[in-house]
Regions:
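Short, flexible loop segments at the rims of nucleotide/cofactor-binding pockets, characterized by
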Residues: 16-20, 74-79
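Amphipathic coiled-coil/heptad-repeat helices and related helical stalk/stem segments
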Residues: 25, 82-83
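Acidic, metal-binding active-site segment of PIN/NYN-like and related structure-specific nucleases
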Residues: 83-120
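Short, well-structured N-terminal submotif of metal-dependent ribonuclease cores
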Residues: 1-39
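Acidic, PIN/NYN-like endoribonuclease modules and their adjacent C-terminal/linker elements
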Residues: 106-155
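PIN-domain endoribonuclease scaffold, especially VapC-family toxins
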Residues: 31-78, 148-154
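Short secondary-structure boundary segments
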Residues: 12, 44, 101-103
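A generic structural signal for short hydrophobic patches within well-formed alpha-helices
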Residues: 15-16, 47, 105-106, 128
């Protein structure tokens, strides 16, 4: 599978950190939210995991409100229930990027096992936020000039 670099998956830890902490997780996901030509993909299982983390660390009302909002901002993908939600969402959603704090997903061993099946970059949010270049990606995937950000990431 060739991953589409305009499709991004954020693992549950990154989704929760985006809401509860901000920092690098928010900076990384703001890149996605700023551009309507980028897609945030996630499975229901992945969103369930993130909602559970938010509920545990914050409160149930915030978790429910987050889930209602993220559902509208995410393209849902399906995968077998026994699969790792973040990795499977990236694979089944044909994503080019998986953002995760999970060291085991970013290991050389995992990379070598994924490589024959998917063209997928697995990075922590700080690396994605620092290295992501919307203009060059747009120009590599579209026939016209980069129009700049077209959405408010805080809206």
């Amino acid at each position: 599978m060739v991953g589409d670099p305009t499709r991004i998956v954020a693992d549950a830890d990154v989704l929760a950190a985006d809401l509860l902490v901000g920092g690098n997780a928010r900076a990384a996901l703001d890149h996605v939210r700023r551009h309507d030509w980028l897609t945030l993909a996630a499975s229901e299982q992945l969103l369930d995991d993130a909602e559970s983390v938010i509920e545990t660390l914050a409160d149930p009302d915030l978790a429910t409100a987050w889930r209602d909002r993220i559902g509208a901002d995410t393209e849902t993908v399906e995968h077998p229930p026994e699969d790792h939600p973040g990795l499977a969402s990236a694979y089944r959603g044909e994503a080019g990027h998986l953002l995760s704090y999970d060291d085991s997903l970013r290991s050389a061993k995992t990379g070598l096992s994924i490589q024959p099946h998917a063209d997928l970059s697995i990075r922590p949010p700080d690396a994605f936020a620092r290295l992501f270049d919307a203009e060059s990606l747009y120009e590599a995937t579209h026939d016209d000039a980069y129009p700049g950000p077209d959405r408010d990431p805080r809206a």
